Swiss-Prot record:
GO cellular component, as recorded: plasma membrane
Gene: wzzB
NCBIfam families reported in the protein's UniProt record: PRK15471.1
GO biological process: lipopolysaccharide biosynthetic process
Family annotation (Pfam families): Wzz (PF02706)
Keywords annotated in UniProt: Cell inner membrane, Cell membrane, Lipopolysaccharide biosynthesis, Membrane, Transmembrane, Transmembrane helix
Lineage: Bacteria, Pseudomonadati, Pseudomonadota, Gammaproteobacteria, Enterobacterales
Record family assignment: Belongs to the WzzB/Cld/Rol family.
Name assigned to this protein: Chain length determinant protein
Amino acid sequence: MRVENNNVSGQNHDPEQIDLIDLLVQLWRGKMTIIISVIVAIALAIGYLAVAKEKWTSTAIITQPDVGQIAGYNNAMNVIYGQAAPKVSDLQETLIGRFSSAFSALAETLDNQEEREKLTIEPSVKNQQLPLTVSYVGQTAEGAQMKLAQYIQQVDDKVNQELEKDLKDNIALGRKNLQDSLRTQEVVAQEQKDLRIRQIQEALQYANQAQVTKPQIQQTGEDITQDTLFLLGSEALESMIKHEATRPLVFSPNYYQTRQNLLDIESLKVDDLDIHAYRYVMKPMLPIRRDSPKKAITLILAVLLGGMVGAGIVLGRNALRNYNAK
């Protein structure tokens, strides 16, 4: 009984089980179909690689400009604002900030145009504002490198133009303020001179009325007041009036400092300033590997997909034959 049971169990096959050897035999017999499927898939992959647009990414790293790059701009700001001028470090941060904003705006514009272009700017190190990594995706390696350099220069020129315009506006405003200050000080000095002459003329009237022709006191600034000025005598007072009338206006040191500031501002030549809002840490690189399409990966996937499709055709065809035979 035990032997018979063993024989029966050994001959009992489950029809639902997959016979791997049988599958391999079927695939081997249908190898030409699989090979043809793989060849077709490879041909399609090669066709795709031939017509697909290549993508190459050129990258550059920038940071805030050096002190030497903004020396002229810093000097102009010192002339315009004097002691209130911003520090060099503040100017550096402001310039790279304006460059980053203008670059981001350009990237947004390129992304929204009909034929999109991918231009990006982002921090090189996470949680650090500087340096910045800028990149451009082009259809050729040389084109991506050239375009990135072109857009960086374009943004720098734009920022430069904006800074020159701001400087010209600030120079015009500073010149007007200084000219107004000079006019005010000149008016005050003229009024002081006129007041002095009127005071002497009034003292001369008193001296004539008192018939004082000769000095009755020593002429010292500490002793003489408006009330005792007539004691200098009419002769001295008449001479003083003539002297005061031809005497140039007397100004404070602040007046001459204001004039010097005005001359300095008027001598500024904004058009000659060469302002750069950034400095290269790494210039636009020439990419050596394209982003897409990847030839090796595409061909490998084509072989795998072609093989899978071919195997599916072989197994499906055999399954259909077996079904029809039943």
